[in-house]
Amino acid sequence: MIQMQTILNVADNSGAKKVMCIKVLGGTHHMIAHLGDVIVVSIKSSIPKGKVKKGEVCKALIIRTKCGVTRSDGSNIKFDSNDVVLLNKQGEPFGTRIFGSVPRELRVKKFSKIVSLAEEVL
């Protein structure tokens, strides 16, 4: 469960390392984001010569959460950290690689480009 002011790790090679959630998109009463939701983030730390700089505001897709998600077969999948992938204005990822594994629930939510860039799909 991701809410405003949550610090998240970035799981792609866009140049950002840490981001902070400043808005959860999806309506007026949508206050908590889960796996596969799009949020607005502010870049808190980045590497030099990256595609994004510290202080920039952009959208991000949540690909891993500590809270986890329950699948239809009853299994539960959790991760060790809260991670996102940065998106541009068209909804495509900034980076060309995604580090770590992503759940297959992202394919159902129409993010097949991100699933194809990932190292492993759970």
UniProtKB/Swiss-Prot annotation:
Task: Tell me the superkingdom of the source.
Answer: Bacteria
Q: Name one GO molecular function term.
A: large ribosomal subunit rRNA binding
- Keyword check for Ribosomal protein: yes
Keywords annotated in UniProt = Ribonucleoprotein, Ribosomal protein, RNA-binding, rRNA-binding
Its GO CC terms? cytosolic large ribosomal subunit
User: Which GO terms of type biological process are on file?
Assistant: translation
Q: What does this protein do?
A: Binds to 23S rRNA. Forms part of two intersubunit bridges in the 70S ribosome.
Q: How does it assemble?
A: Part of the 50S ribosomal subunit. Forms a cluster with proteins L3 and L19. In the 70S ribosome, L14 and L19 interact and together make contacts with the 16S rRNA in bridges B5 and B8.
The entry's family comment says: Belongs to the universal ribosomal protein uL14 family.
Query: Under what name is this protein listed?
Result: Large ribosomal subunit protein uL14
